[in-house]
């Protein structure tokens, strides 16, 4: 994937960049794998805002992705690489030998016509899914399960990857994109390779309207609000907030750790690096 820039025909165009989408082979998704999702606007079933800065955006259909890769020892051919509006990575449509079709996250360098397979005896090549116990140390992996059979939860966004560092007893140590080293069960499934669309991080949105197309609403600064709306609000003229930075609910921010101790903490071998 490459990045496309524009001539500065307007202020919004001046610094705007966009993907060239050259790896995408079709703009018609597989209808049997599409689902309608209703937009929430960041509200819950009471109609109250539970996630701020969400709303609007282009109408989308959700693509059902196979994160479990539980179709063992049946080869599948890549029939297309497609855009997915619900994620930063591209997705690949697989046609299995028995006729079934499934979408997966498209790893780097996966092309139409390639064959992928999942199972403990699969080759170590991008797109193949294996139990971690069958993957050699040092291998670059993505789409990693945390619970056996639940489906991949780690290293799924564009350009991300994890690395298999060690195996001990029934656990493997995996270095995650954040720098955290974590223990994962050896029987959990992971996919070989790095997630594709690695230039996604270099895309410049360029203008406010493009964020609105993506369903992102403006983030208003606390110091620009009234005292009733935010702890930093109010004051005569422009002020700095008058206290250490806090969230709208008074919890310290900018470096303050809010993660509670939980059972899964014991699986973290090394904390993430800043």
Curated annotation (Swiss-Prot):
GO MF entries: rRNA binding; structural constituent of ribosome; transferase activity
GO biological processes: cytoplasmic translation
Region (Disordered): 223-258
InterPro entries for this protein: NA-bd_OB-fold (IPR012340), Rib_uL2_dom2 (IPR014722), Ribosomal_uL2 (IPR002171), Ribosomal_uL2_bac/org-type (IPR005880), Ribosomal_uL2_C (IPR022669), Ribosomal_uL2_CS (IPR022671), Ribosomal_uL2_dom3 (IPR014726), Ribosomal_uL2_RNA-bd_dom (IPR022666)
Keyword terms: Ribonucleoprotein, Ribosomal protein, RNA-binding, rRNA-binding
GO cellular component, one term: large ribosomal subunit
Cystine bridges: none
Subunit structure as annotated in this protein's UniProt entry: Part of the 50S ribosomal subunit. Forms a bridge to the 30S subunit in the 70S ribosome.
Protein's job: One of the primary rRNA binding proteins. Required for association of the 30S and 50S subunits to form the 70S ribosome, for tRNA binding and peptide bond formation. It has been suggested to have peptidyltransferase activity; this is somewhat controversial. Makes several contacts with the 16S rRNA in the 70S ribosome.
Entries under PANTHER family matching the protein: LARGE RIBOSOMAL SUBUNIT PROTEIN UL2M, RIBOSOMAL PROTEIN L2
Family affiliation: Belongs to the universal ribosomal protein uL2 family.
Name of the protein in question: Large ribosomal subunit protein uL2
Species, as recorded: Geotalea uraniireducens (strain Rf4)
